[in-house]
Structures are given as structure tokens and as C-alpha cells.
UniProtKB/Swiss-Prot annotation:
NCBIfam families: deoB, PRK05362.1. Isomerase that catalyzes the conversion of deoxy-ribose 1-phosphate (dRib-1-P) and ribose 1-phosphate (Rib-1-P) to deoxy-ribose 5-phosphate (dRib-5-P) and ribose 5-phosphate (Rib-5-P), respectively. Its EC number is 5.4.2.7. It is found in: Cytoplasm. It comes from Rhizobium meliloti (strain 1021) (Ensifer meliloti). Belongs to the phosphopentomutase family. This is Phosphopentomutase. One of its GO terms (cellular component) is cytosol.
Length: 406
């Protein structure tokens, strides 16, 4: 029996999606613009990285071919490898948002065909009656922020007042999200998580996709740092995903990183938390060593999005891609006959783009394993085909929204 390993490089888009203009993202290209900056020397950073973007392993799996499919051109400074060792292509999203749950649920075979609720960008983000209910039921003296913001910026702006007053920092973005930042010592991590559970219940009436706990430490704006104790409180997917179908078939689903939170822990058999891309990679390798026949190992590599995409850090994003790429031989050595690895993404977050939000992009789909022969599948018209490829590979029924790419 086969095994499948699904790795989501969070926000690693490869060129604007066909409907990008409707999202204000026409021209966005996470990979292309990172490569362009690297080729021009604009992503050099002392002690971190320098020179053209160097992704030899993903290139050998078809990444540059996929990028050319998505955009019609090669990323700057990049060349096609002499040989490709995997099945490759690009995929466009059909879900109506460019957020994390929409992307992941669609990858798992369940597109989001409804509209999420969003909070306004002008004025106070949250309705007065919601703020009042949060203060009353969450037992807090008020809130700070109440706006669209970058997480690191708003913590720097309000962190000291939060520590003095005990008021949590509440903010949102262009995603369907309610984020709460609080100090782990002065406010307390457990209290923050309890507050998020209260808010999760309260924002259900507003059709908000996620409530996110954003704990931080430090004593002043210069030392405030978000910790690895982030927690996402998502609603349930609108219908069963490939995770549910695997679980019903008696298979093991290993959820690593924030995968469990994204799926509200539905369809998850084993949960592993880790902080940082390299720790997530290590945890994935450990799960692969343990995974039995028929199992799925599903990992989200969040640093690309959280640390570099939203913060518009081109050098950091490039270095993170290069570090991930360098680990792929460690993965390849652990594969057995019948194993399949899929590298993909859930949306874009172009670090050269205006603002701090996600970008509507096509994503790469790179599939490899000891028994897979190299070819292109072209451009898939839904991320759902990724999940159904997993379903077919693992020998369970294909769902209603996609088809296998192999």
C-alpha cells in the first residue's frame, strides 16, 4: 500500500491567478519577484544570503517549468534543469477567498464556494456590539487596536499600553480573521486562549473564518517578539475533506504544524506542533519514519507567509526557500517504493507587493516519489485536484470536486 506526504509552503505563489484583478493582485508573483530581486542583488543581506535565487532541488522537480506554465516566462536569473524528476504543473484556486482555510480546504478537496464575512478597513473594524460582548463575556476591560493592521506593527504600537491596562490588542486584515495579541506573562497565555474561544463563538454570527491567538513576550517595542504559541481557531470545513475520508477508511492522518487548527482538528489522527520551518521539516521526517501504509503526512510550513510574506521581507523569504530546498535530499532518502510527495502552496504573499496581505496567485504542484515518472500535467483549474490525487494514490474514493492528476 502507498503513503502520501503533502507539504504546503504557505504563500509560495508562482504568478497571478486568472482572477487576480478582482482581488487587486494583477501582476503579483511571489516566486518571480523574489527571483527578480535576487538576480539584481536587491535581496542580498550580510550574514543571510546573496546572489541569484538558488533552488536546485525544487528546480529539478519542475518548479521553473511550473512557473513558466503559470506566467509564460522563467523567473529572473533562473534556468531550466537538464532533467526533471517529478510530475509538475500549476494550479488555480476556485474558492472565493485568498485566505489560509480556503486554500487548505480546497487542497483537501473541498472548495469554499460561499463568501466569508470581513471587517471594514475604514474606521473601527469591529461593531460596537461585538466589542461589548467580547469585553463582557471575555472579562476584559476593553480592547486596543480595533483596526486592520500588521501584527508586528500593532504590537509595537500598543504593546506597552496593553501591558499596563490588560486590554488585549485586537485587529484584522483583508482575510476573514479576528486576531488577538496578548503578552504571555502580563496577560497570560491560557487567558489569551480562553478569550479566543469566547471570540470564536461570538464571531460565528459574522461568518468569520478564523480567530488567531498571537502571544508575544518582551518589555518594550524594541524587544517585543511573537512566540511560537500561536493558535488558530477555525470553523469546520463545509463538507468532508480527504482527511475525513481517509480517517473513515481507517487510515492515519498526521497533521503537522497548524494543519490541525486549519481543519478544526477534524479528520486528524495524530497532531504534532513545531515552531519554525526547520523544526517542522524535522517533525515531518519523524512522521514519515513512523507512517504506516496508507497514511497521509500533511504539513504547513508557515514561516514563508508569517515571517516573510506579510512582513514584505524579500531577503528573508529567499533565504527560507533556499533553506527548505536544501532539506529535500533528507526527505528523498527516506522515501520507499509507493511513496508520493506533493509540494504546493495555499495562496501567494508576494513580499514585493503593496500592503501586507495575501496575493491571489497560482501555486506550484510538484509531485515525486520512487515510482513516479516525470511529466507535466499543465495547469489544474482547482486546488481540489491535489487532494483527489492523494485520495487516488492512497486507494480511497475520489471526491466530487476534483480529479486525480496522476
Amino acid at each position: 500500500m502507498a503513503r502520501a506526504f503533502l507539504f504546503v509552503l504557505d504563500s509560495f505563489g508562482i504568478g497571478n491567478a486568472p482572477d487576480a484583478e478582482a482581488f487587486g493582485d494583477l501582476g503579483a508573483d511571489t516566486l518571480g519577484h523574489i527571483a527578480e530581486f535576487c538576480a539584481a542583488g536587491a535581496a542580498d543581506r550580510a550574514g543571510l544570503r546573496e546572489g541569484p535565487l538558488h533552488l536546485p532541488n525544487m528546480s529539478a522537480l519542475g518548479l521553473m517549468h511550473a512557473a513558466r506554465l503559470a506566467t509564460g516566462r522563467l523567473p529572473a536569473g533562473m534556468a531550466l534543469p537538464e532533467r526533471v524528476y517529478g510530475i509538475y504543473g500549476a494550479a488555480s484556486e476556485v474558492s472565493r477567498g485568498k485566505d489560509t482555510p480556503s486554500g487548505h480546504w480546497e487542497i483537501a478537496g473541498t472548495p469554499v464556494t460561499f463568501d466569508w464575512g470581513y471587517f471594514p478597513a475604514e474606521g473601527d473594524a469591529f461593531p460596537p456590539e461585538l466589542v461589548e460582548a467580547i469585553c463582557r463575556e471575555g472579562d476584559v476591560p476593553g480592547i486596543l487596536g480595533n483596526c486592520h493592521a500588521s501584527g508586528t506593527d500593532i504590537i509595537a504600537r500598543h504593546g506597552e499600553e496593553h501591558m499596563r491596562s490588560g486590554k488585549p490588542i485586537c485587529y484584522t486584515s483583508s482575510d476573514s480573521v479576528f486576531q488577538i495579541a496578548a503578552h504571555e506573562q502580563t496577560f497570560g497565555l491560557e487567558r489569551l486562549l480562553n478569550l479566543c474561544e469566547v471570540v470564536r463563538r461570538l464571531v460565528d454570527d459574522y461568518n468569520i473564518g478564523r480567530v488567531i491567538a498571537r502571544p508575544f513576550v518582551g518589555s518594550d517595542p524594541g524587544s517585543f517578539t511573537r512566540t511560537g504559541n500561536r493558535r488558530d481557531y477555525s470553523v469546520l470545513p463545509p463538507e468532508p475533506t480527504v482527511l475525513d475520508r481517509l480517517q473513515e477508511a481507517g487510515r492515519t492522518v498526521h497533521a503537522i504544524g497548524k494543519i490541525g487548527d486549519i481543519f478544526a482538528h477534524q479528520g486528524v489522527t495524530r497532531l504534532t506542533k513545531a515552531n519554525g520551518n526547520m523544526a517542522l521539516f524535522d517533525a515531518s521526517l519523524e512522521a514519515i519514519e513512523e507512517a504506516e501504509d496508507g497514511a497521509l503526512v500533511f504539513t504547513n510550513f508557515v514561516d514563508f507567509d508569517m515571517l516573510y510574506g506579510h512582513r514584505r521581507d524579500v531577503s528573508g523569504y529567499a533565504a527560507a526557500l533556499e533553506a527548505f530546498d536544501a532539506r529535500l535530499p533528507d526527505l528523498d532518502r527516506r522515501l520507499k517504493p509507493g511513496d508520493m510527495v506533493i509540494l504546493t502552496a495555499d495562496h501567494g504573499c508576494d513580499p514585493t507587493w503593496r500592503g501586507t496581505d495575501h496575493t491571489r496567485e497560482r501555486v506550484p504542484v510538484l509531485m515525486f516519489g520512487p515510482t513516479l515518472r516525470s511529466r507535466s500535467f499543465g495547469i489544474a483549474d482547482s486546488f481540489a485536484h491535489i487532494g483527489e490525487t492523494v485520495a487516488r494514490h492512497l486507494g480511497i474514493g475520489v471526491g466530487p470536486h476534483g480529479r486525480s492528476l496522476i
